[in-house]
Amino acid sequence: MLQLSFITLITLAVTSLAQPATLRLNFTPASGKFNDATKQYQSIWDAEGRRMVEAMEQVSGLKFQETDVRAIVYEGVSDSGFADRPMRLRASYPEGVKKATLVHELGHRLNIQVRRRPKELDEHRVLFLYLYDVWTKLYGKEFAGEMVEVEKKRKGIYDYESAWQWALSLSEAERAAKFKEVVKMNLSGRK
């Protein structure tokens, strides 16, 4: 019996070492007035973060390289940050848009691995090759469609509307194939 327990412990230890590193998001309010929004982002992440990461990795075929990401909750334009620069997330979004925004901004961080791309594909067009499909996998087509409409209404910083129209003019299979081409460009460039 003791030998069986020892073997079980060794198996569990080896299994946990073989698991991929968990992506942790550390949410901080920019000021006290964003405490509630910060708690909501944290609650979403605690409940759904693992599923989000799994869906993003499965659909994109990429794996997150980071293990810890700082996220500041404030009232301004959401931004993925980069390396040591924290992610910044808008406080006033409703819960559904907060979920979509987390996936969107994490997608930019995931895409750091695919810097080489055809000239006609900017960073959002690359992201949109799989973002809709991740949202669909996580929350269904209705949610994904609603979030596309939310993003299409954003004006000034980027032309989300034409980027989404372009991405969704392709079938799911065409988007996936195009994204694989981008990934392949980056793999062939590694030594």
Predicted feature residues:
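Auxiliary, metal-adjacent structural segments of Zn-dependent hydrolase domains
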Residues: 25-85, 138-140
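Pan-zinc metallopeptidase signature
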Residues: 152-191
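Active-site recognition of the HExxH zinc-binding catalytic motif
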Residues: 100-113
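Post-HExxH zinc-binding segment in Zn-dependent metallohydrolases
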Residues: 114-163
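Boundary at the C-terminal end of the N-terminal hydrophobic targeting segment
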Residues: 18-20
